[in-house]
């Protein structure tokens, strides 16, 4: 039962790390990356459809995204969605594909993005700490019910803390890598 609490906690902490990685992937770092368009949706036959499901997105150059829609009639809609988005990018439409040039980031914008990265990282750390708290509460319930001894409670509590420390270390590493990517000129 207590091993179950540990494995569930570990799984939840890994999910928090993965969510952070996905979230940071959508932050523009001055380099072309197909995940920039992950949150972008287009109204396609009455349904909000993600662009990455209706077009091929490739990175031909370091600062260029090439969007090739499977259905050429939707090209204008994708262009409008990009212009309306908060990406700050202007697509170049040549009738069959869209080209997105990724401009260099200004120093001020880099600092804003680093703040955003730190905020996302802090939210992930809070999620991990909440998972730790839930695990400790579950272990205390097991001890109260007589399923585990007080010594087991202490031992499993230390294991939960080790998982938490490891997860926070991973989050710090992910954050540091993203900050370095953003600050790279």
Curated annotation (Swiss-Prot):
- How is this protein annotated for GO cellular component? cytoplasm
Query: What SUPFAM superfamilies is this protein classified in?
Result: Ribosome recycling factor, RRF
The record's section on InterPro entries has:
Ribosome_recyc_fac, Ribosome_recyc_fac_dom, RRF_sf
The family database entries (Pfam families) matched by this protein are listed as:
RRF
Q: Which domain of life is it from?
A: Bacteria
Q: Which UniProt keywords apply?
A: Cytoplasm, Protein biosynthesis
Q: Name one GO biological process term.
A: translational termination
UniProt GO molecular function = ribosomal large subunit binding
Localization, per the record, is:
Cytoplasm
Briefly state the protein's biological role. Responsible for the release of ribosomes from messenger RNA at the termination of protein biosynthesis. May increase the efficiency of translation by recycling ribosomes from one round of translation to another.
Q: Which family does it belong to?
A: Belongs to the RRF family.
Recorded hits in NCBIfam families, A to Z, give:
frr (TIGR00496)
Alphabetized HAMAP family for the sequence? RRF (MF_00040)
The molecule here is called: Ribosome-recycling factor
Give the species: Listeria innocua serovar 6a (strain ATCC BAA-680 / CLIP 11262)
């Amino acid at each position: 039962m207590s091993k179950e609490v540990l494995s569930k906690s570990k799984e939840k902490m890994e999910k928090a790390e993965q969510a952070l990685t996905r979230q940071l992937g959508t932050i523009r770092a001055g380099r072309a990356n197909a995940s920039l368009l992950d949150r972008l949706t287009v109204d396609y036959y009455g349904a909000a459809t993600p662009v990455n499901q209706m077009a091929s997105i490739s990175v031909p150059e370091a600062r260029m995204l090439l969007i090739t829609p499977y259905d050429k009639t939707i090209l204008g809609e994708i262009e409008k969605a990009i212009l309306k988005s908060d990406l700050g990018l202007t697509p170049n439409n040549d009738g069959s594909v869209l080209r997105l040039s990724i401009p260099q980031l200004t120093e001020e914008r880099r600092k804003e993005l680093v703040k955003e990265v730190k905020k996302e990282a802090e939210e992930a750390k809070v999620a991990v700490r909440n998972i730790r708290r839930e695990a400790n509460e579950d272990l205390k319930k097991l001890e109260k019910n007589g399923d585990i001894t007080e010594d087991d409670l202490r031992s499993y509590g230390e294991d939960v803390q080790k998982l938490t420390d490891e997860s926070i270390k991973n989050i710090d590493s992910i954050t540091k890598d993203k900050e370095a990517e953003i600050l790279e000129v």
